[in-house]
Every structure is written in C-alpha cells, then in structure tokens.
Amino acid sequence: TVLATGGCGQVFRVTTNCRQNTGDAHAVALQAGLPLMDMEAVQFHPTGIVGPGNLATETQRYVGGNLRKKDLEPFMAKYAPKMKELAPRDLVARAIETEIREGRGILNPDHNIEHVWIDLRHLSDYVQEVQIPEVSGFFKQFMNLNPRTHLCPVRPSNHYQMGGIPTNSFGEVQKSPGTTISGLYAAGECGCASFHGFN
C-alpha cells in the first residue's frame, strides 16, 4: 500500500497547493497510531499571488521586480542589504511577513488578506513578454491586473510540507527509527525521509 496524498497545504490561508492537499494521509497515520515527524517544517514561497496563492516565481525578482510596502517604498535592503530581492526564499518570506505584521502591508479587500506589492511596471516589454510571461499571465488571469501598469499583490504562500509520515530512504513507513511496517509506503509530501531539511 502506498500513501501518496500530498501535503497539508490547505490548512494555510494562502497556499500553492491544490485543494486536495488536506493532510489526509497524515490523519490516517495518526488514527492508526503511527507517528508524524517534523510537521513544523514548512516551506513558504515568498511571493504567492494574493487570493489563489499561485507562485509569482523568483524570476520576477531576478529580472528586477521590486517588493514595496504600503507607502510604496522598497524594503528588502533593510533585510538583505546586498542581495535585496535576490536573497534566499526564507529570508524574503520572513521580510515580507515582518512588513505585514508591523503594519506596513496593504489589505486586499477582495480576499481580506494583507500583502505587499511586487512592482514590475518599470520592466521592458521584452522582459514582460519573453522572460516572465507566465507571471504576467497569472496576474492578469487571477487578479485582473496588468503588471505593466499595476502594482501586483503578493505575500508568502505555503509551498511544501517537509515533515510527514516517517520513512526510510526506500519510502517504507517507520513505526519507530529502524522499524518499518511491511508493505506500507509513503511518497511525496505526505512522507518524510528528512532529505529536504527544514526549508
């Protein structure tokens, strides 16, 4: 038997996960008396599109997109003076969350969620059409915003569950370290072999 139900991203208000990722395998494991491990280890993508949670990929920041707070001032230099928007995901996600929690975010009235802006307006047509067409397309499709003329709302979005049902490197479920359950496997986000670390 293989458990492969995905993670539990739907417990978060903003997630990149599909609606089916509700932690079903985790619940089944707990009900069967099996342990879970490292459930606090959750990766957040820094720039999820407000509402659907879809990723606005790192590419938008790599090509020159700027994160801005409520007063439209950029803020990443405060958290990563040299790398700014190109800092590692976890640092950018924490910086955005800090700005929001300290009152410098913007409330999106349609979704009742606070966010910051990603500013892509200054990017050339070539960049918008060739280098980041999917990002521009997502903002148009899900938010009815044109990144050439509008600031776009983003916030950290639950992305990947590192913890889950303990397995060995073959995916066999472990009742305790070194003790596997014959014929029971966990794969993907519902399992945890500690390959990914905590982020």
State where each predicted segment sits:
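A conserved FAD-binding loop/helix module that cradles the flavin
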Residues: V11-A32, I181, A193-N199
